[in-house]
Curated annotation (Swiss-Prot):
Protein name: Large ribosomal subunit protein uL10
Record keywords, A-Z: Ribonucleoprotein, Ribosomal protein, RNA-binding, rRNA-binding
CDD domains per the UniProt record, alphabetical: Ribosomal_L10
Signal peptide: none
GO cellular component: large ribosomal subunit
Similarity remark: Belongs to the universal ribosomal protein uL10 family.
Length: 171
């Protein structure tokens, strides 16, 4: 790779590290092209991406974020899974690594924080942003539904009383 190509790749990686909610670092040695394609499809479905990176460029792109721990993640054949959603990439990579032992999760960089493999596994168990939004909307709507029911209850009871008097008078 010539100098211009390296600088373009470096700028691309800087953009990835700045724009990602989480960057999961993996060893991918032994994965076939078909398995890599399947992994990329799984990640893409969740809005995440998978990219093989040069360790030296990744370390420079990190620019000291996460200190030595983050730098230590980039050794050997490394690829990154990243997404704006802090949970999506971790969840998809963890799911794939359970099915295929050739993909080994080393750790992750999440903002200034560096996670180990167990941290990534714990992150993968959290609900995604969309699931959290759904739960929040459900929590917000539940009291509103109850309030509407309480407000309607006296009116419906009054209507039943009037209806009962009307049917009593008719009889």
């Amino acid at each position: 790779m010539d100098k211009a190509g390296k600088s373009a790749a470096l700028e691309n990686l800087k953009g990835v590290f700045e724009g990602a909610g989480v960057v999961v670092v993996t060893h991918y040695a032994g994965l076939t092209v078909a398995e890599m394609t399947k992994l990329r499809g799984l990640l893409r479905k969740d809005g995440a991406h998978f990219k093989v990176v040069k360790n030296r460029l990744a370390k420079i792109a990190l620019g000291g974020v996460g200190g030595d721990k983050a730098q230590d993640l980039f050794q050997g054949p490394v690829a990154i899974a990243y997404s704006p959603d802090p949970v999506a990439a971790a969840k998809a990579a963890d799911e794939f690594s359970r099915e295929n032992s050739k993909l080994v999760i080393i750790g992750a960089v999440m903002g200034e924080q560096v996670l180990d493999a167990k941290g990534v596994e714990a992150l993968a168990k959290l609900p995604s942003l969309d699931q959290l939004r759904g739960k929040i909307i459900g929590v917000i709507q539940a009291p509103a539904t109850k309030v509407a029911g309480v407000i309607q209850a006296p009116a419906s009871q009054l209507a039943r009383v009037v209806s009962a008097y009307a049917s009593k008078d008719a009889a």
